[in-house]
Structure formats: C-alpha cells, structure tokens
Amino acid sequence: AILRRKSDGSSQWQDGYPNEGVVDDDLSKQYGYVLVEGKTIIGYCALILNDEPAYKTIEGQWLSNEDFIVIHRIAIAPDHLGKGLVQTMLTYIEELAKEQHIHSLRADTNFDNAAMLHLLQKMGYHYCGEVMMRGGKRKAFEKYSG
C-alpha cells in the first residue's frame, strides 16, 4: 500500500508510517483485522471504537455524536489489488458495526489519495470536513446508518 500510494503520486504513508510496530500495537490492543485467502493474509485494517483524539477537533461537523468505529490503515496485498477487496472489507465493517448497534463509521484520508476518496464516496460516506492527523490535514468522512 505504501508503494502504491507513492506510485499514485500521493504523499500519504511516505514517511515510514504505518510500520510493523504500528501493526503490532494495533494487534496488541485488538484493533487489527485481517482479510485472509486460505492461510495467507491479503488485507489489513485497524478498527478503533470511539478513540481517535484527532477527531475531537474537526473543521466541519460530524453527522452524529453517537458511538463510532474509526477505520484506519486499510491495505491490500499488491497481488490482490483491483479485486474490490477494500470494498469487501468496508462492507464487513458495516456488518460488524450493526451487530454491535453502532451506527457511525468514520475514516480519514489524504487529499491526494484518489482511490480511497473515490471508494469512500462510492460506499456512501459523507465528507464532513478536515482533521489534523500526524501533522497534516486529512479529509474526514462519516457513514451514518441510524
């Protein structure tokens, strides 16, 4: 995903983040989710309940003030790109949220991550404004089903 962002001309994830330590931390906190094919991990994301300090201050407005799941660090193995797997993961996340009676999903991405911007809009996420993440502004999105 880091190399794909670079080849797309995006500045997102070009500073050594995310790295193995970040993923290890996600897993130790039970935030990490994997998409597998057989015994091979082909996708990854972090899902965090109600805990993203950067989302407390938004230039704009969230759609809701209810509990939410933050979606971070979605990545697909290079040899599985173009198969709609990020969409599959987002659909699964929506189902997981519904099972937990959570109606709000939030995500952010760089202004130049065209693929993710397109997918979030395609999947019904609404642009809510800008948040500061790791020293830079990000476009913030929410999908609310309440």
Regions found by a protein language model. Give the residues of each.
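Conserved GNAT-fold acetyl-CoA-binding loop/helix
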Residues: 2-22
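Conserved GNAT acetyl-CoA-binding A-motif
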Residues: 90, 97-109
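Hydrophobic adenine-recognition pocket in adenosine-nucleotide-binding enzymes
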Residues: 74-76, 109
